[in-house]
């Protein structure tokens, strides 16, 4: 019989067994799921953006390097700023 280092509910954090507490293991699982998820490259729109290091994301197709969040290529705050900039640009283009 093969023993697995993860469980159905906790996923990859099952490797820690009963150590460190449930909340921490659940948070770790959520972070690891976000890290491993496939993201689209903002340059070529190909879904092969991978995490190379802390806040460094590299496209496997075009080789573009992007600075983003630690666990996702774009943070929540980054999305808010991008929307605000887009609104300002649109309002200026309407005035002209």
From Swiss-Prot:
Keywords for the protein's UniProt record, in alphabetical order: Metal-binding, Ribonucleoprotein, Ribosomal protein, RNA-binding, Zinc, Zinc-finger
Ranges annotated as spanning the membrane: none
ZnF (C4-type) intervals: 41-62
Biological-process GO terms, alphabetical: translation
InterPro entries: Ribosomal_eL37/eL43, Ribosomal_eL43, Ribosomal_protein_eL43, Ribosomal_zn-bd
Single annotated GO MF: large ribosomal subunit rRNA binding
One annotated Gene Ontology cellular component of this protein: ribosome
Cofactor(s) the record lists: Zn(2+)
Any Pfam family: Ribosomal_L37ae
Tagged with keyword Endoplasmic reticulum: no
Cofactor: binding comment: Binds 1 zinc ion per subunit.
HAMAP family, sorted: Ribosomal_eL43 (MF_00327)
NCBIfam families the record matches: eL43_euk_arch, PRK03976.1
Family, as annotated: Belongs to the eukaryotic ribosomal protein eL43 family.
Protein name: Large ribosomal subunit protein eL43
